[in-house]
Amino acid sequence: MSIDTQKVIEDNKRSSADTGSPEVQVALLTARIELLTGHFKTHKKDHHSRRGLLQMVNRRRSLLDYLKKKDVERYKALIEKLGLRR
């Protein structure tokens, strides 16, 4: 179980050389969060990894807040594309 980083970047980049835009960062974090969520279904007591998951969720929240402040249309498009509720 791993994420295909290149595919996630390809699906969410804004230009040909884009790897660091908020959209790409949020998409990568979302993929990692979904992967870890599945991990916790079988490993309920893995508290060390759960801490990392919470850090990723908080980082994603910060990036989404930044994007919402900078460009609401890009924010709405990203939320809809990734299926995040807010």
From Swiss-Prot:
InterPro entries: Ribosomal_uS15, Ribosomal_uS15_bac-type, uS15_NS1_RNA-bd_sf. It comes from the Bacteria. The keyword Ribosomal protein applies. The keyword Nucleotidyltransferase does not apply. SMART domains: Ribosomal_S15. One of its GO terms (cellular component) is cytosolic small ribosomal subunit. One of its GO terms (biological process) is translation. Keywords: Ribonucleoprotein, Ribosomal protein, RNA-binding, rRNA-binding. Part of the 30S ribosomal subunit. Forms a bridge to the 50S subunit in the 70S ribosome, contacting the 23S rRNA. This is Small ribosomal subunit protein uS15.
